[in-house]
UniProtKB/Swiss-Prot annotation:
Organism of this sequence: Lactobacillus delbrueckii subsp. bulgaricus (strain ATCC 11842 / DSM 20081 / BCRC 10696 / JCM 1002 / NBRC 13953 / NCIMB 11778 / NCTC 12712 / WDCM 00102 / Lb 14)
Subcellular location: Cytoplasm
Residue ranges constituting the TrmE-type G domain according to the UniProt record: 224-382
Record carries keyword Acyltransferase: no
Top enzyme category: hydrolase
Gene responsible for this protein: mnmE
Amino acids binding GTP: 234-239, 253-259, 278-281
Pfam family, one: MnmE_helical
Listed name of the protein: tRNA modification GTPase MnmE
Binding site for K(+): 234, 253, 255, 258
Length: 461
């Protein structure tokens, strides 16, 4: 478990993306944050200003007296800050040179360059947030839809933390009772204690199940669905990509083989984030460039969470169509019967019967039934959970894996009791479940896990 400490060196980093813009923010956190910035700041004495104030002045190189930039310095004193340390944020003009010059001056005057995610790590170590809230910080930054942002904000406010700590408390209450009975066996009725253990294990396991039921939806909102748009050449793949992205990223022509590679784009479809991959048409070709595109398309199909398979409804099924139906069998897919405006030689009913998949008839060029296609994508992966703003979702594999581990440990408790094992032996798995749940929030997480998690954060956060 990571020790709760407040004695760190002072760190600095640029918190805004590098490049030209209105402003850049350089963040400084630590015991000497105010003193270090004050050495460079010409204006009010920052060591005497009230907390949570914004102060106008200039950053000046103390070695040369050169003015670097006109800035606003926000002073926030511990403990009412993100890291629970003293923080100064320097708002300077946006630009690579000026921002880096200010950072280098801070480093030359006593600050250390922050590691990726170190500000958030300090917030965790100092007890400001738990691990689920730390993860939600990056989820907010990376959110690709409004719903993903809402879920991340809910988690940042402690939604999952509250649920997990309540489960741990249920286990702890029973563990305390077991410990007393082990210490004072003359007062123990082992059958009664075993019944309490079993009842608690079943109750907590049921609540874990309800959380795990949200894991698919939560991880889709967080990571998006890899969605491959496939079909033989010139059936409308690029037209569908352009409709969903509202762009002309893919070249649309009547020439087969126009898309020679895979094109990727992130879009929100009814609140579901899709990583759309427009694949090259899969067909026999002697063109070496097209061959590479076809192989990449097959790889994209293998890795996809969802397949949008386009067929030309104005023509009979070709051998290439049948190969694609076979290649995508077993994957979650929607068959899009395109070009209904040209007359139909294929019907949705017969394709659905032959393929066992959902089928939508449409004319992408005429924008017919495309809203129904979007609704079907949402229906395939969501069960109404995403419509509730109050629902707590499990949003990543780490959380889901630890919940599953705790559930298995509780199942071992139940099977052990049913097999007649002594309570003090069964208690080991019961304590294990309590610790597994604690790893989710960081209450009992090993240092290696903590360091690995925060290393994935961006610099300056």
């Amino acid at each position: 478990m990571v020790q709760r400490l407040t004695e760190f060196d002072t760190i600095a980093a640029i918190s805004t993306p590098l490049g030209e813009g209105g402003i850049s923010i350089v963040r400084v956190s630590g015991e000497d944050a105010v003193a270090i910035v004050n050495r460079l700041f010409k204006g009010k004495d920052l060591e005497k200003v009230p907390s949570h104030t914004i102060n106008y002045g200039h950053i000046v190189d103390p070695a040369t007296g050169q003015v670097i930039d006109e800035v606003m310095a926000s002073v926030m004193l511990a403990p009412k800050t993100f890291t629970k340390e003293d923080i100064v944020e320097i708002n300077c003009h946006g630009g690579i040179v000026v921002t880096n010059d200010i950072l280098q001056l801070l480093l030359a005057n006593g600050a250390r360059m922050a590691d990726p995610g170190e500000f958030t790590k300090r917030a965790f170590v100092n007890g400001r947030i738990d691990l689920t809230q730390a993860e939600s910080v990056m989820d907010i930054i990376r959110a690709k839809t409004d719903k993903a942002r809402q879920v991340a904000v809910k988690q940042l406010s402690g939604g999952l933390l509250t649920e997990i700590r309540a489960l741990r408390q249920e286990i702890l209450d029973v563990l305390a009772n077991v410990e007393v009975n082990i210490d004072y066996p003359e007062y123990d009725e082992e059958e009664v204690t075993a019944q309490k253990l079993l009842a608690c294990a079943e109750a907590v396991s049921g609540k874990i199940d309800r959380l795990l039921e949200t894991a698919q939806e939560g991880q889709i909102l967080r990571n998006g669905l890899k969605t491959a748009i496939v079909g033989r050449p010139n059936v409308g793949k690029s037209s569908l990509l352009n409709y969903l992205t509202q762009s002309d990223k893919a070249i649309v022509t009547d020439v087969a083989g126009t898309t020679r590679d895979t094109l990727e784009e992130f879009v929100s479809v009814k609140g579901v984030p899709l990583e759309l991959i427009d694949t090259a048409g899969i067909h026999h070709t002697e063109d070496q460039v097209e061959k590479i595109g076809v192989e990449r398309s097959k790889k994209a199909i293998a890795q996809a969470d969802l397949i949008l398979l386009l067929l030309d409804g104005s023509q009979e099924l070709t051998e290439e169509d049948r190969q694609l139906l076979e290649l995508t069998a077993g994957k979650k897919r929607i068959i899009v019967l395109n070009k209904t405006d040209l007359g139909q030689k294929l019907t949705a009913a017969e394709i659905a019967k032959e393929s066992g998949s959902e089928v939508i008839s449409t004319s992408i060029m005429m924008k017919e039934n495309l809203d129904e296609l979007e609704a079907l994508i949402k229906k395939l992966f969501f069960k109404g959970i995403e419509n509730s703003n109050d629902q707590v979702l499990v949003t990543n594999q780490r959380q889901a894996g630890l919940l599953a581990k705790a559930k298995q440990q509780l199942a071992d408790v139940a099977s052990g009791l049913e097999a007649g094992m002594p309570v003090d032996l069964v208690q080991i798995d019961f304590t294990g479940a309590w610790e597994s749940l604690g790893e989710i929030t960081g209450d009992s997480a090993p240092d290696e896990l903590i360091n690995d998690l925060f290393s994935q954060f961006c610099l300056g956060k």
